């Protein structure tokens, strides 16, 4: 599906799939849980899902003769960390807008984790006091113009690399990769669980798995707390990506499965249930999930297993998208473990 698109390698190769044996047994053993470790996909600044997307975006950035990657996220954005890492790797400058998306108070929140790594990698970090929104932001557009005014050649990458024209391609590749791994494993996964916020990871998976009719087996767990906007954006990206890869069929709103029950109390703030899911996964599997994204999708998957959402005997693949550095911004929350 991706043969005609240029790819700039930023990852090690296919990511490992491991069985979550102890977590599966803890939840009754009737559903078999697996994780695809996108969090271990690269040596670039702790890796993560954004690199899979950026592999199809960076060739366009280089071809444009730009010299500066310009992007945006929250204070503890995993995406902006990855932009900083890739900019360093390819010899570009990096301008990052970090908005106050999360109403979280921690004495070190803006000095540790992702934003610390971005600064170490040489990014020009601009803090902006604006609330959460997955759409195009004025502060980002102003940063692009500022780079131009100073003689730079900006290459704009939106939040999460999601509404970029090539933002969905990387996770079409994820689906193709899973199909190869399923042949090696000797079975197919019945469901794929993924955290959904800006939407292109979910959208790309939907398109990729639509090739063999499994688009509705991709179960998005909303972490945005703006699910209507998020679902609309996932569908828009999926449709655009389907055209790019010549899927040959139209995707509908019904093809986007988004479960809205776990994003509370608000984007970036973990509920008690999210915190318990983070601890449970860490203590049973040694696998770290973060309070913003993967902790909420892990909470969702655990709860869905408990509720019987997945039929007995199901094999469920959890897409671990990364994000562990952000947990440093929640040091007080987890001060006692």
Curated annotation (Swiss-Prot):
CDD domains: ACCD. The keyword Transmembrane helix does not apply. The keyword Ion transport does not apply. GO terms for biological process: 1-aminocyclopropane-1-carboxylate metabolic process; amine catabolic process. The active site is at 77 (nucleophile). The modification N6-(pyridoxal phosphate)lysine is found at residue 50. Its cofactor is pyridoxal 5'-phosphate. It catalyses: 1-aminocyclopropane-1-carboxylate + H2O = 2-oxobutanoate + NH4(+). Its EC number is 3.5.99.7. One of its GO terms (molecular function) is pyridoxal phosphate binding. Keywords: Hydrolase, Pyridoxal phosphate. Belongs to the ACC deaminase/D-cysteine desulfhydrase family. Catalyzes a cyclopropane ring-opening reaction, the irreversible conversion of 1-aminocyclopropane-1-carboxylate (ACC) to ammonia and alpha-ketobutyrate. Allows growth on ACC as a nitrogen source. PANTHER family: 1-AMINOCYCLOPROPANE-1-CARBOXYLATE DEAMINASE-RELATED. Homotrimer. This is 1-aminocyclopropane-1-carboxylate deaminase. It comes from Rhizobium rhizogenes (strain K84 / ATCC BAA-868) (Agrobacterium radiobacter). The gene is acdS.
